Every structure is written in C-alpha cells, then in structure tokens.
C-alpha cells in the first residue's frame, strides 16, 4: 500500500519539507523467535559422531563392490541418496558410480536396451545432473512410428513421473524433451483427476505427483525436498533402514546448526537496529536466511552463509532506499559515496539515515576482510565491486523514474539483470567458500564477464520478480518493469507480456542446464550456486512475492527448515 509521508532533507543548511512516496511493508512476523538458540558442544559432537558412524555403514552397503553390475538398482539408490539430501556426504562415490555407468554406455549401449521408461528416465536425469552429455536417443524406444510418445505409456504412471522429472533437464532446442513435458503433464494431471474419485484422501503416489507438478526436482531446494522425501521414503516397505536413520539424524543435526547460525545473524541484525534506523525497509532477516540456506545448506559453508546473509540484508535495505523511500537527490549522494568507498564521505551524506547506512556498509565489509588471511582479501574486493555495481544499477533505475523515462526492453535488461541482485549474490556467494582452491582470482574474473549461467540465473530472478510484483507496483509511483517496457515496445496486453516473461524463464532454465554439461567453464561447486539461486526464485516468487509479503510458502519453509525437527 502506498502512502505519502513528510521527511526532512538537508541542503545548503536549509531544511526543506519533502513528500516521500513510500510503501508500508508489514513488520517481521517472527519477532525475536530466533534470537536465542544454542546447542551444547557435547550434544553437537555426539550427534556428529552418530552421523559419521552411519555414513561408514551406508558407504559400505550402498556403494559396495557387490552392487557393481546392478546398474538399475545402483541408479535408484543414488537417486534416493540425493532426494534424502545426503549426496554431499558421498560426492566422490556417486561420481565414480555415474562415471562407471556412463562408460558402459560409451562401450555398448545395448547394456540398457531392455530398460523400462522409469529406469531410462532416472539414468538420463542423474547423468545430466552431473554434467554428462547423454543423448536423447535414450528415449527412441518409447516413441511410435510417427515420432510421438507411445500412448500405451499413459498407464505407466511411475514411468511418466520419472520422464516428467527428466524433461526438466532439457537444453535449448531439445524439442523431444518439450514434448515429453507436455505428454507427461497431460497424463499425470489426468491420473490425479481420476484418482481423486477412487482415493479421495490421496494415496502416496498422488501426493508425489502433485508435488512434482508444482515443484519438479530440478527446481526444488535440496534440503526442503529432503524433509518431504524422508516422510515418503519412511512409508516405503523396501526402504533401507540405515539410510533412513542417517537422513533423519543428518536433517535434525543440520537444523540445529542452522538455528544457531540464524540466532547469531539475528543478533547482528538487532544490533544494527534496522527497525529504528531504516523503518521504511523490509525487516526480513529470517526470510533472507532461508534464501541463502537455499544457496548452500551444507555445514562446510557456514562461514560463507554468514557473510552472504549479511550482504543480502544490506542490499535489501539499499533496494528499499532506491525503490521506495529515498528521493533522487539522496540517491545521487549515496551512489557518489559508494563509488568512492571512503569514510570521509560520511559528512556529505544527508539525511542521517544515509550516514547510518553508509557507515554500516563500510564497517561490514571491513569486518569481512578481517576474517581472511592477507592473500585472500581479494575475495572481499571482488564482492565489494559487485555490490557497487548493484547500487549503480539501482541509481540508474531511479534516474529513469525521476525523468519519467521508459527504456526499451533491451536497454532495461542491461540494468535490471544487474539490479536483480544475482550477479552480486553469485560473486559474494564465493567470498566465504573454502573449497580446496576452487575459488580463485580466475573464477572471479570469469564472473566479472557475466557468464551465461549467471545471466540465466539472473534472468529467472528478474522475470519472475517482475511478474510476481507487477500488480502491487501499480499502486505507487514505481520504476518501470520488464513487463511495462515489453507492453509499450510491442503494443501487447499485460497478460501477453507476462506470458513472454514466463517463456523467457523457461529458456533461462534450459540455458542453466546446458552450462552444466561437460566440459564446463567452472567447477561444479561454483555452478551449483547459480542453479540454487534460480531455485530460490522458483520457491519464493512462483506464486507471488513471498519475500515482500510473507505468505504460506515462506512460513512453511521456515517451519520445515528451522522450527520442526523430524521425530
């Protein structure tokens, strides 16, 4: 809801009354709930010891030599391990298994000539996920003489569900997988409609299909899906008891660790006194933690998460300064100070909220630098430069609004892909990563050229954000969105423009998939950050802006990941 408020501005020692357009964002719905949490070190060590013991049992049982020739069962077990959120424990074992299977294809594809649709789809999906260029020929046996998928497959519901999931690993130009998506979506939807009449309380398969149609595996946060899948796997009579026990212990252990992280970040946020210093800004530190937990949930990235949550919180305040509170003269003062990045600029910043923001920003990055050895401070430098670039983008958009300028879509995207924040978040996600020399200066230089996978992830963010927020933005004076630019440039309706943005999201996902196929420009742990950033958008913006207006999706995600342990 838009309102007008009075504010004061300082210029030439004169006080002027200013009418600000601003948006009334609802306060944090969590209060101080996550402010205090601790887990005794003895308890933490005990739980970690349990996990380590079970890992060794699983390593022998699941990845033992006795499974070496049972490729179908091996793939299904790998799939289960991934769905349970445990793959980060067994990365080398999974990679070795998949390499072995891929080599078998290269030597003699007839090894797989009798596989079912379910098996073929799992094989395709898992190999593609791990960067192997698997041919679409794998699905030829399931097509009729006219090149269409055989109608008899409509009765193979499990196979259809697997093919549906596999179709989301498509790249640009792979029409067969587009056909597979349409074919499976049609028949899975029909299955749900027919099954409702026979099983009104929903059977497990129907629940799994409903969830997949809403959020396919490729677009799902790993840790969020793990909680859901644990409850499904537990009801499977053939489940591996040790694997299930490990999944439960690991999930609860991670949840405890994440709650401790959030309590520390919440105290940092409270010390900033954001609600008082920046009352116009969205108070969403819990939601931002969920955002970054989607980027990486694994325990080895705790340090990186701490840095990235603070950076995204600072960028969210800046977004609200430029988008919904500050006036253009203030925007200019702030960006000039940001470009100089010098404490001596402080006295030139008025009103006081700009000084406070600038001081917090500079202090935060100084504190980040202090966490690194001298030879690694370059990481913070690159993060700082991408943050500056983000705010320059905010300023350019503010200039459009101030001048009443409507850019072309192409001109808009040169700026708005930057202001999506994803170029900045991608670079800053690597600042705190400690991954065996994977993150180097060369990687940051590669990122500075806006590689295709990062542009694609930023595109998912930009288009989904604009579609989700378009209607609410009409209630106030606002920066033109991609939707409005497209409508004006091509003379189309709002609905047609939204359809085009959604179509571009589909293409961006295909580009992300393509960039994972070997040989890749960067190591997998780096590429996964771009993928996960896109996944967060699918969670929070698929059905409206669940960050600005915290809705059921966000509340449920917080409850699952940070409140409710697995019994």
UniProtKB/Swiss-Prot annotation:
Show where the record puts the motif DDXXD motif: 319-323
- CDD domains xrefs: Terpene_cyclase_plant_C1
- Per UniProt, the enzyme's principal EC class comes to lyase
Q: Which reaction does it catalyse?
A: (2E,6E)-farnesyl diphosphate = alpha-humulene + diphosphate; (2E,6E)-farnesyl diphosphate = (+)-valencene + diphosphate; (2E)-geranyl diphosphate = beta-myrcene + diphosphate; (2E,6E)-farnesyl diphosphate = allo-aromadendrene + diphosphate
- Where Mg(2+) 1 is bound, by residue? 319, 323
Q: Known EC number(s)? A: 4.2.3.-, 4.2.3.104, 4.2.3.15, 4.2.3.73
Q: Binding of Mg(2+) 3: at which residues?
A: 465, 473
Q: Mind telling me which PANTHER family this protein's record contains? A: (-)-GERMACRENE D SYNTHASE, OS04G0344100 PROTEIN-RELATED
Q: What does this protein do?
A: Involved in sesquiterpene olefins biosynthesis, constituants of cannabinoids and terpenoids-rich resins. Catalyzes mainly the conversion of (2E)-farnesyl diphosphate to allo-aromadendrene, and also produces minor products such as alpha-humulene, valencene and palustrol. Can also use (2E)-geranyl diphosphate as substrate with low efficiency, producing minor amounts of myrcene.
Protein name (record): Allo-aromadendrene synthase TPS4FN
According to its UniProt entry, this protein's organism is Cannabis sativa (Hemp)
């Amino acid at each position: 809801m838009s309102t007008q408020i009075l504010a004061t501005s300082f210029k030439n020692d004169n006080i002027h009354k200013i009418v600000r357009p601003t948006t009334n964002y609802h306060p944090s719905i969590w209060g101080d709930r996550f402010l205090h949490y601790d887990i005794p070190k003895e308890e933490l060590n005990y739980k970690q010891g349990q996990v380590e013991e079970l890992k060794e049992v699983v390593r022998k049982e699941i990845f033992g030599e006795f499974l070496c020739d049972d490729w179908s069962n091996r793939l299904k077990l790998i799939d289960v391990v991934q769905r349970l959120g445990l793959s980060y424990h067994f990365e080398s074992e999974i990679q070795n298994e998949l390499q072995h299977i891929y080599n078998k294809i290269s030597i003699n594809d007839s090894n797989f000539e009798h596989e079912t649709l379910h098996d073929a789809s799992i094989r395709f999906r898992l190999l593609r996920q791990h960067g192997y260029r698997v041919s679409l020929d794998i699905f030829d046996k399931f097509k009729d003489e006219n090149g269409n998928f055989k109608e008899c497959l409509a009765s193979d519901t499990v196979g259809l569900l697997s093919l549906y999931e596999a179709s989301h690993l498509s790249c640009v130009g792979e029409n067969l997988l587009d056909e597979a998506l349409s074919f499976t979506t049609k028949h899975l939807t029909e299955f749900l409609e027919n099954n409702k009449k026979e099983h009104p309380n929903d059977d497990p398969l129907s629940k799994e299909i409903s969830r997949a149609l809403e959020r396919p595996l490729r677009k799902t946060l790993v840790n969020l899906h793990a909680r859901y899948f644990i409850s499904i796997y537990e009801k499977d009579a053939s489940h591996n008891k040790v694997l299930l026990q490990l999944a439960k212990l690991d999930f609860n252990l991670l949840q405890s660790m994440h709650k401790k992280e959030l309590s520390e970040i919440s105290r940092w946020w409270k010390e900033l006194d954001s609600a008082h210093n920046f009352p116009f800004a969205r108070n969403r530190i819990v939601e931002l933690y969920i955002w970054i937990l989607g980027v990486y949930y694994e325990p080895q990235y705790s340090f990186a998460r701490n840095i990235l949550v603070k950076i995204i919180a600072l960028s969210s305040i800046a977004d609200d300064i430029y988008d919904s509170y500050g006036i253009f003269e203030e925007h200019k003062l702030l960006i000039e100070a940001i470009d100089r990045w010098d404490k001596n600029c402080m006295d030139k910043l008025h009103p006081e909220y700009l000084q406070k923001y600038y001081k917090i920003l500079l202090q935060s990055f100084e504190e980040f630098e202090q966490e690194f050895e001298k030879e690694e401070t370059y990481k913070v430098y690159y993060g700082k430069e991408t943050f500056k670039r983000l705010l320059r983008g905010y300023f350019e958009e503010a200039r459009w609004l101030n001048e009443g300028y409507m850019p072309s879509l192409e001109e808009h995207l040169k700026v708005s892909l930057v202001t999506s924040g994803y170029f900045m978040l991608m670079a800053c996600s690597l600042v705190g990563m400690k991954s065996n020399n994977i993150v180097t200066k060369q990687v940051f230089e590669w990122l500075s050229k806006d590689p295709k996978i990062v542009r694609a992830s930023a595109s998912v963010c930009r288009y989904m954000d604009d579609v989700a927020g378009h209607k609410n933005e009409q209630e106030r004076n606002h920066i033109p969105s991609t939707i409005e630019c497209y409508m004006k440039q091509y003379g189309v309706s709002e609905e047609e423009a939204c359809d085009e943005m959604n179509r571009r999201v589909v293409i961006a996902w295909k580009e992300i998939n393509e960039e994972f196929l070997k040989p890749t420009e960067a190591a997998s742990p780096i590429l996964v950050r771009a993928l996960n950033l896109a996944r967060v958008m699918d969670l929070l913006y698929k059905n409206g802006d669940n960050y600005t207006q915290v809705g059921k999706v966000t509340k449920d995600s917080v409850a699952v990941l940070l409140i409710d342990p697995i019994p």
